Amino acid sequence: MKLAVIPGDGIGVEVTAEALKVLGKLVPDLETTEYDLGARRYNATGELLPADELDQIRQHDAILLGAIGDPRIVAPGILERGLLLNMRFQLDHHVNLRPAQLYPGALSPLAAQPEIDFVVVREGTEGPYTGNGGAIRVGTDHEIATEVSINTWFGAERVVRYAFALAQTRSKHLTLIHKTNVLSNAGAIWTRAIETVGAEYPDVETAYCHIDAATIYMVTDPSRFDVIVTDNLFGDIITDLAGAVTGGIGLAASGNIDASGTNPSMFEPVHGSAPDIAGKGIADPTAAILSAALLLRHLGREDDAARVEAVVAADLATRGEGPISTTEIGDRITAAL
């Protein structure tokens, strides 16, 4: 397995090291190449994503990312657009995969729920994040700004197809979340994609939920969801809520996936770089380790992925409230494998 590693900034470096321990234990032929991308690199050289390094990254089987950003040295927005979004578009990471599972011992406002275990499949390369828009008369009382949301049949259909295939392996239930009663043009594409692809999956039950209602149900009745498919903007919102109800984004893993397999997919914890605690050895690497499990599953190593998730669940259940270091968590999980 050839793995491109981007530790990034802050605690990204620390949690990535623990995820690599886990991968090294399970993958004897693991080959890693580290790429120094992020706030430190940009602050020192002005480089965000050099073309030659992106070409090198393309040659790997997958990418493991830590966390990017440090507002103390790089203004917000520069790295998000110039590095993260740029990489997403360049590598056609059209599926953003966000599992949401409430593990034993996780602190959640919904801890009394019998079970929370669903997955959000978010479209990753369209919607209002394509940079299609602009502003005129800036700074005047007549300023006008537009952000155009791009929705294509090609983009929606391939993400919906991925979601149906995933639902087939789980509880065979798929929910489309959108706002079709107001966003009728984009909504029509997504609805037609569900109907068209759904005809190929007759045993997968489908449902529809408006985005505003979905935020209520995710808090009051999360067990109604198994696989959720949605567009880029709604997915951005709903996945953070999913993280909150399952113990916080500190436990949330994610995958940015090119479902065609043409480009390597990237896996990362959802949390940020937290420069205020970097170097203190107190960052929780659980999300990075669960992201490594997603990476293993994506590359066809289902048994290894399931082992990691089971060990993480057992570790969380016995962790308690006392302080525990980043490396200790990584060592315990690695040893238990």
UniProtKB/Swiss-Prot annotation:
It catalyses: (2R,3S)-3-isopropylmalate + NAD(+) = 4-methyl-2-oxopentanoate + CO2 + NADH. It is found in: Cytoplasm. Its cofactor is Mg(2+); Mn(2+). Gene3D superfamilies: Isopropylmalate Dehydrogenase. NAD(+) binds at residues 272-284. The keyword Chloroplast does not apply. It comes from the Bacteria. Substrate binds at residues 88, 98, 122, 212. Keywords: Amino-acid biosynthesis, Branched-chain amino acid biosynthesis, Cytoplasm, Leucine biosynthesis, Magnesium, Manganese, Metal-binding, NAD, Oxidoreductase. Binds 1 Mg(2+) or Mn(2+) ion per subunit. The record marks 129, 179 as: Important for catalysis. Pathway: Amino-acid biosynthesis; L-leucine biosynthesis; L-leucine from 3-methyl-2-oxobutanoate: step 3/4. Mg(2+) binds at residues 212, 236, 240. Catalyzes the oxidation of 3-carboxy-2-hydroxy-4-methylpentanoate (3-isopropylmalate) to 3-carboxy-4-methyl-2-oxopentanoate. The product decarboxylates to 4-methyl-2 oxopentanoate. Homodimer. This is 3-isopropylmalate dehydrogenase. It comes from Rhodococcus erythropolis (strain PR4 / NBRC 100887).
